[in-house]
């Protein structure tokens, strides 16, 4: 077992890197990969960079160059569930693109041509994540739909459209569906775990800057706890 862990930004992986033992650094295509162990498990951590293309490159390299057998995506997200507050966790029940539209050819909104409408995470990884929640104390965690697009969402009109298109969406972010799609094609189990940094509204840019460290730390703590469950 070797677990690939992907975060887009430094605050999303800093706690994980600090938790590594026997760390070895590699640089491929301008992306740093750090191999080592956490909780006795072999892991490779990478800060992919922001967005779907960057995440796809990093995921492919984890699978092809480092032979990871499972992938965990960690980081921050904008919340779409009123009962959740900043710092709370969403564990993926499914992952979809929210900015894809080829409905003219009979596909669902959010479904890329020749791909499934939703990418379903590995059941064992989801269960391990749910068991790991207790390590976070009073932080609330739910399973839910996570949607991905190459935009930071803070426009109320755009939020309204997204809610109409994906009424069960719990969180939105900028990498998860790309990671999930790569894992789907390589048949590698995955899970997406996101901590809320904002609520996808007009205040989101301010909230994000203020709370990204908190959200990244919560999500990373969740991943460390998950690794102890595997």
Swiss-Prot record:
Pathway given in the UniProt record: Amino-acid biosynthesis; L-methionine biosynthesis via salvage pathway; S-methyl-5-thio-alpha-D-ribose 1-phosphate from S-methyl-5'-thioadenosine (hydrolase route): step 1/2
Binding residue positions for substrate: 78, 153, 174-175
Keyword annotations: Amino-acid biosynthesis, Hydrolase, Methionine biosynthesis
EC nos: 3.2.2.9
One Pfam family here: PNP_UDP_1
GO cellular-component term (any): cytosol
Enzymatic class: hydrolase
Active site: 12, 198
Any one GO MF annotation of this record: adenosylhomocysteine nucleosidase activity
Annotated catalysed reactions: S-adenosyl-L-homocysteine + H2O = S-(5-deoxy-D-ribos-5-yl)-L-homocysteine + adenine; S-methyl-5'-thioadenosine + H2O = 5-(methylsulfanyl)-D-ribose + adenine; 5'-deoxyadenosine + H2O = 5-deoxy-D-ribose + adenine
Superkingdom classification of source: Bacteria
One GO BP: L-methionine salvage from methylthioadenosine
InterPro entries (alphabetical): MTA_SAH_Nsdase (IPR010049), Nucleoside_phosphorylase_d (IPR000845), Nucleoside_phosphorylase_sf (IPR035994)
Keyword Ubl conjugation found: no
PANTHER family given in the database record: 5'-METHYLTHIOADENOSINE/S-ADENOSYLHOMOCYSTEINE NUCLEOSIDASE, 5'-METHYLTHIOADENOSINE_S-ADENOSYLHOMOCYSTEINE NUCLEOSIDASE
Function: Catalyzes the irreversible cleavage of the glycosidic bond in both 5'-methylthioadenosine (MTA) and S-adenosylhomocysteine (SAH/AdoHcy) to adenine and the corresponding thioribose, 5'-methylthioribose and S-ribosylhomocysteine, respectively. Also cleaves 5'-deoxyadenosine, a toxic by-product of radical S-adenosylmethionine (SAM) enzymes, into 5-deoxyribose and adenine.
Family per record: Belongs to the PNP/UDP phosphorylase family. MtnN subfamily.
Protein's recorded name: 5'-methylthioadenosine/S-adenosylhomocysteine nucleosidase
Organism whose genome encodes this protein: Shewanella denitrificans (strain OS217 / ATCC BAA-1090 / DSM 15013)
């Amino acid at each position: 077992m070797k677990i690939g862990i992907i975060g887009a930004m430094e605050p999303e992986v800093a706690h994980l890197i600090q938790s590594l033992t026997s760390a070895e650094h590699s640089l491929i295509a301008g992306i740093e990969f750090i191999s080592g162990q956490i909780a006795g498990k072999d892991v490779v951590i990478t800060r992919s960079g922001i967005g779907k293309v960057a995440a796809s490159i990093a995921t492919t390299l984890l699978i092809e160059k480092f032979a990871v057998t499972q992938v965990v995506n960690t980081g921050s997200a904008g919340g779409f569930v009123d009962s959740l507050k900043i710092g709370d966790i969403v564990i993926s029940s499914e992952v979809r693109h929210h900015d894809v539209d080829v409905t003219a050819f009979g596909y669902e909104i959010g479904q890329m041509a020749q791909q499934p409408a939703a990418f379903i995470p590995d059941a064992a990884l989801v269960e391990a994540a749910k068991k790991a929640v207790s390590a976070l104390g009073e932080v609330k965690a739910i399973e839910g739909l996570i949607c991905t697009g190459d935009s930071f969402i803070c426009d109320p009109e755009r939020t309204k459209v997204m809610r109409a298109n994906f009424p069960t969406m719990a969180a939105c972010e900028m990498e998860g569906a790309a990671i999930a799609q790569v894992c789907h094609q390589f048949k590698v189990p995955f899970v997406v775990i996101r901590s809320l940094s904002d609520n996808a509204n007009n205040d989101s840019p301010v909230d994000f800057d203020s709370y990204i460290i908190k959200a990244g730390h919560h999500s990373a703590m969740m991943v460390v706890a998950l690794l102890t469950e595997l």
